[in-house]
Amino acid sequence: MPSLQTRSPFTPDQIAQFQSQGYFILENLLTAAQISAIIERFDPLFDTQFETGIYPDEWYGRPGLSQLNATRQMTGMWRCDRTLAGYSLSGEIAHRNAALMGWDGGRYGLDICWIKPPNAPEVTFHRNNTYVTAIDPPNLITCWIALSHCTAATGTLEIVPGSHHWNCSDQVRFLHAPQEDYRTPLWQAATEAGMATPEILPLELPPGNAVFLHGNLWHGSNRNTSETQTRRSLALSTLPAHAKFQPLGTGAGYIFNRYRRFGSLDIDESFYPILWQHDGYRTPFLADYCSDALAVIGG
């Protein structure tokens, strides 16, 4: 019998659905207690109270500096907070991500929280792979986890099923509060791909449910029209374990590029650790740095 380390966390039909549609919804990935543990770490981080003393890679929506309805986003939280690192660096999530992509291992790519207060503006439609073209191969998969009731009214994630198959281009752009229609990049891509009427699917997700997104799937989010509800989510992205850097000057990825090693295209595991691998390997320092919040007991 295969061990928990090698056994696929998905059925062949589930993997086939993901490969066909570019997404897969998993119910009850997180418990209510786990969700509370995650959310209670957000306010200290946005108040620049970093447990490890290390700043995140990127953040938007700072108290006292940004508009009250600004979408708050933070990237690289695992470097700041070990509680959140238990989720961002989870081998269980990396295993699930890698299984859907057909990889034999996965390493940390990005960990991002999205917090949309009432009347928060739209997030422009985009493809995640567009932002990792400094990596070879420029492919990632994202586990997007609802931490609150994500509905059309609260500006939930919107996806276009099957759009990861489109033959179209995309470009790096600022995603927050677009001046034009937030769907404009999608319409342009659909026209280029010969898709007359792309289907936009708003995902209704209760807290704890997750959707796995192919890196080429078009997605964005509408305005939070609720007067009282804040929409929260956690997006955990995985790169293939064998990934390297593209030659310097190739592709986009300003966050990734700051962690390059001089004279090498290898990705340093100190900054982008391997979280799960088919042969059981996991970057050694993780055992001392944080617990795996979703570790499965047994073998």
Where are the predicted features?
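Phosphate/oxyanion-binding loops and surfaces in catalytic or ligand/nucleic-acid-binding neighborhoods
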Residues: L45-T48, W103, C150, W166, ...
